[in-house]
A protein has these predicted regions:
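A conserved FAD-binding loop/helix module that cradles the flavin
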Residues: 203-216, 220, 474-502
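Beta1/beta-strand and adjacent pyrophosphate-binding region of the FAD-binding site
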Residues: 1-13
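Flavin (FAD/FMN) cofactor-binding core of flavoprotein oxidoreductases
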Residues: 112-115, 231-239, 277-282, 434-451
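Glycine-rich FAD pyrophosphate-binding loop
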Residues: 6, 22-52
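Predominantly flavin-linked oxidoreductase catalytic cores and closely associated redox partners
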Residues: 121-392, 396
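Short glycine/serine/threonine-rich phosphate/pyrophosphate-binding segments
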Residues: 13-18, 199, 206-207, 486
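Residue-level recognition of phosphate/Mg2+-coordinating polar/acidic sites
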Residues: 42, 63-65, 73, 82, ...
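Conserved N-terminal/central alpha/beta ligand/cofactor-binding core
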Residues: 39-132, 137
Length: 504
C-alpha cells in the first residue's frame, strides 16, 4: 500500500502531524495522501487518560512564561511552538466543535471535561482533512529506499463470532447470543515518500508507548539520550511494603515485544539497546502500601511548600498542592520535583522532600498560635479526662487535615507543643525510590534533538524522515505543557514533510 506521507503513531503528536500535512498538501493542485499507522485498536489511547481523564490539553501562557516549564532545549521547541501556539490548538479543536475552558494556572480543558472529546475532535479533523487512520497496524521494520521508505507491518483484523450453544434454551430471552473476538493477523507492506515518527516515549506502555521509535531512529544513525521517568510518583521511605516488591522488570512493563523464545520455548530477553536504562530505585506501583502508606493514601495537602533536598542541599522549591496516592507523592508538587529527584536517585544520591504546611506563616507566629490554641483546648470542659495524646491530636487537627494527624504523629514520635511549629514548617520525608515507566506521565530523554532540524523537524541523518512529540528528547512540567509541545511539533513536522514533498 502506498501513501505520500505516513505518520507512525496515532497519539497527540501523530494525529496533529497528519492534520498539518493534509492541510499543507491541500494547498497544491495535485494534493497528496496522508496515512496514520497506529498499532493499538484505537488511536489516542494516552490522550484519553491525561489530566485524570479530563485532558489538560494545553496551557495559554505566553512563550516567555511557557518556556520556563520546558526542561530541555528551549530553542529547539521555539519554532514549533510559534508555528502552532496554544491559541492555535484551541482554534483547531474549535473548528470541529470542541469548546474549551481555562482554569487555574492557565490550564486549558475541554468544556465537557472529557478527554474522549479531545480524541474524537482530532479524529474528526483527520476525517475532514482526508487523512486515513489505520489502527491495529504495527510497524515492524523501516527500510529507506531511493524513493522514500518501505515499512513492513502486521495488520490485525478483529471480528466477533458467535459461540456455539449446546442448548438454545440456555439463551436468555432478548439477550444477544454470546460471542468471542476472533483475530486475523497478516503481513502488509506500506511505502511512502516522507515518513514521520511520532510513536511517543516509554511511559504508560499499556497505551502503546513501548520505545519503538527509538529503535528505528537508532537504526538510521540517530543517538538516543538515556530515558528515565518524569512526572512520576516519589515513594517515601516506609510508604511501601518493599519486602513484597517483585523487583520491577522494566523490560516486561515498558519494553514489551523484545522477548524472544529459544528452541526450548523458554522465554528469554532480547538484548537491550544501550540507551535503555534500568533503575535500582524503581519501585513498581503495584507494590502494596505499608500500614503508614495506607494512612497517607487518599489525602491531599493544598497550598503547601515543598523543597527537594539532594545530598542534604535544597535544590528546588515549589508551592501548590500535593497528593498522597497508592503510588506515593503525586499531584502538581510531587510531579514538579520528580524529574530532578529521579535523576538524583539514579545517580545514587540521597533524596528527601521537606514540606512546609504553613508557608504563609512565620514560625514564631505559628508557635504563638499553637500555644494559644493549646491553652483553649486544655481549659475546655470537654477536655476533662482526655489523654494528652488525644488532646494533642485535637490540636493538630485544627492545623492540618484530620486524616493526616495519625501519619504525622507516626513520623514525629518526639513532637511536643513546643516543637510542633517547627515540625509543621519542615515535615521531612526521605525518598526510597520512584514509580517507573509503567505509570509516569512523560518520558525524559529520547532522540537527540541536535540531530534534528528545529525549523522543520527533519532528520539530519536520513532525508525525508521527521520526528514529533515525546519520542524526541524534550519534556516539560505538568500543566498542559507536554501536550502542547506534542501538538506543536506534530503540526510542524507534518507541514514540513508536505512542503518538502511539494518541492520535489
Amino acid at each position: 500500500m502506498r501513501s505520500d506521507i505516513i505518520v507512525i503513531g496515532g497519539g497527540a503528536a501523530g494525529l496533529v502531524a497528519a492534520i498539518g500535512a493534509a492541510r499543507e498538501l491541500a494547498k497544491t493542485e495535485n494534493g497528496g495522501t496522508v496515512t496514520v499507522l497506529e498499532k493499538m485498536p484505537k488511536a489516542g489511547r494516552k490522550v484519553m487518560i491525561t489530566g485524570k481523564g479530563r485532558c489538560n490539553f494545553t496551557n495559554v501562557k505566553e512563550w516567555g512564561d511557557f518556556s520556563d516549564h520546558i526542561r530541555t532545549d528551549v530553542n529547539f521547541v521555539s519554532p514549533s511552538w510559534h508555528n502552532l501556539t496554544p491559541q492555535g490548538v484551541m482554534d483547531l479543536l474549535k473548528s470541529v466543535g470542541l469548546r474549551s475552558v481555562v482554569e487555574r494556572g492557565d490550564r486549558v480543558f475541554p468544556e465537557s471535561h472529557m478527554a474522549g472529546d479531545v480524541v474524537d475532535s482530532l479524529l474528526r479533523c483527520c476525517t475532514l482533512e482526508g487523512v486515513k487512520v489505520v489502527t491495529d497496524c504495527e510497524v515492524k521494520t523501516i527500510d529507506p529506499t531511493p524513493r522514500g521508505f518501505s515499512l513492513d507491518c502486521v495488520q490485525t483484523s478483529r471480528k466477533q463470532v458467535r459461540i456455539p450453544v449446546d442448548d438454545p434454551r440456555k439463551l436468555r430471552p432478548g439477550k444477544p447470543a454470546p460471542t468471542r473476538e476472533e483475530l486475523t493477523i497478516e503481513p502488509v507492506e506500506y511505502t511512502c515518500r516522507k515518513l514521520i515518527i511520532a510513536t511517543g516515549g516509554l511511559s504508560y506502555p499499556g497505551t502503546g508507548s513501548t520505545g519503538d521509535g527509538y529503535l528505528w531512529a537508532e537504526e538510521m544513525g540517530h543517538r538516543v539520550a538515556p530515558c528515565f521517568p518524569s512526572l512520576t510518583a516519589l515513594v517515601p521511605v516506609g510508604y511501601k511494603n518493599l519486602e513484597t516488591n517483585p523487583l520491577a522488570d522494566e523490560i516486561k512493563t515498558a519494553f514489551r515485544g523484545r522477548t524472544v523464545y529459544g528452541k526450548t520455548k523458554e522465554r528469554k530477553i532480547a538484548p537491550l539497546p544501550k540507551w535503555y536504562p534500568t533503575f535500582p530505585a524503581h519501585i513498581e506501583r503495584i507494590v502494596p502500601l505499608s500500614a503508614l502508606g495506607e494512612q497517607f493514601n487518599g489525602n491531599t495537602l493544598e497550598n503547601v511548600q515543598l523543597t527537594l533536598l539532594v545530598g542534604g542541599d535544597a535544590v528546588q522549591t515549589e508551592f501548590g498542592d500535593i497528593e498522597f496516592t497508592d503510588g506515593g507523592l503525586e499531584g502538581p508538587l510531587g510531579f514538579m520535583v520528580s524529574r530532578r529527584a529521579v535523576k538524583a536517585l539514579n545517580d545514587g544520591q540521597k533524596v528527601a522532600v521537606e514540606l512546609d504546611l504553613k508557608p504563609a506563616v512565620e514560625v514564631e507566629k505559628l508557635d504563638a498560635d499553637i500555644h494559644e490554641r493549646w491553652q483553649e483546648i486544655i481549659h475546655d470542659e470537654r477536655s476533662k479526662g482526655q489523654s494528652f495524646h488525644r488532646l494533642f491530636r485535637i490540636l493538630l487537627g485544627k492545623l492540618i487535615p484530620w486524616n493526616l494527624t495519625i501519619p504525622f504523629l507516626d513520623t514525629h514520635a518526639d513532637v511536643s507543643v513546643d516543637t510542633l511549629a517547627a515540625a509543621l514548617k519542615a515535615w521531612r520525608m526521605d525518598i526510597a525510590g520512584f514509580v517507573g515507566f509503567e505509570r509516569c506521565v512523560v518520558t525524559a530523554g529520547g532522540i537527540d534533538t541536535s540531530e534534528v532540524v528545529a525549523k522543520t523537524l527533519e532528520s539530519k541523518k536520513q532525508p525525508g524522515l521527521y520526528f514529533a512529540g515525546e519520542v524526541l528528547d524534550m519534556d516539560c512540567d505538568t500543566g498542559g505543557y507536554n501536550l502542547q509541545v506534542a501538538f506543536s511539533t506534530g503540526y510542524l513536522a507534518g507541514q514540513s514533510a508536505a512542503k518538502a514533498l511539494n518541492n520535489n
